[in-house]
Curated annotation (Swiss-Prot):
SMART domains given in the database record: Ribosomal_L14
Name of this chain's protein: Large ribosomal subunit protein uL14
CDD domains: Ribosomal_uL14 (cd00337)
SUPFAM superfamilies in alphabetical order: Ribosomal protein L14 (SSF50193)
Function of the molecule: Binds to 23S rRNA. Forms part of two intersubunit bridges in the 70S ribosome.
Organism: Sulfurisphaera tokodaii (strain DSM 16993 / JCM 10545 / NBRC 100140 / 7)
Organism superkingdom: Archaea
Subunit note: Part of the 50S ribosomal subunit. Forms a cluster with proteins L3 and L24e, part of which may contact the 16S rRNA in 2 intersubunit bridges.
GO cellular component, one term: cytosolic large ribosomal subunit
Keywords in alphabetical order: Ribonucleoprotein, Ribosomal protein, RNA-binding, rRNA-binding
GO biological process assignments: translation
Protein family per UniProt: Belongs to the universal ribosomal protein uL14 family.
Pfam families: Ribosomal_L14
InterPro entries according to UniProt: Ribosomal_uL14, Ribosomal_uL14_arc, Ribosomal_uL14_CS, Ribosomal_uL14_sf
Length: 138
């Protein structure tokens, strides 16, 4: 049985970067090109409030564009880039050019073998297996 994935820590004061039904780019070479966020793991919100996710959060995505093997399927994914600016503990603000995810297996290992583009330092610290195939960490 795979070990339990770390889902969410403290969410106080976080910028709501991505929400339900946000279209995201898939940054790895798993065959998927574009996906839609359909669920956010570990989110405990208020009734009728739209759930949101941030960098390094685990989400459920539905692949909309890609190879026929992965299209119309659901996968777990880790958010590695978001366009909404967010603040780091040292006071710097950072924002990326696009919203991007990396598809992972149920045990947390990436499905692809390389990641196109940079990934956030927060995602690299929380998901070391994802960071091992990243080309650039910002």
């Amino acid at each position: 049985m795979p070990e339990k994935l770390q889902v969410l820590g403290s969410r106080k004061g976080l910028t709501p970067g991505l929400q339900h039904y946000t279209t995201v780019t898939v940054a790895d070479n798993s065959g998927a090109k574009e996906a839609v966020i359909i669920g956010i793991y570990g989110y405990k919100g208020v009734l009728r409030r739209i759930p949101f996710a941030n960098i390094a959060d685990l989400v459920m995505v539905s692949v909309r564009k890609g190879t026929p093997e992965v299209r119309k399927q659901k996968f777990k994914a880790v958010i590695v880039r978001q366009r909404m600016p967010f603040r780091r503990p040292d006071g710097t603000w950072i924002a990326f050019e696009d919203n991007a995810v990396v598809i992972v297996n149920p045990d947390g290992t990436p499905k692809g073998t390389e990641i196109r583009g940079p990934i956030a330092k927060e995602a690299a610290e929380r998901w070391p297996k994802v960071a091992s195939i990243a080309t650039m960490v910002i």
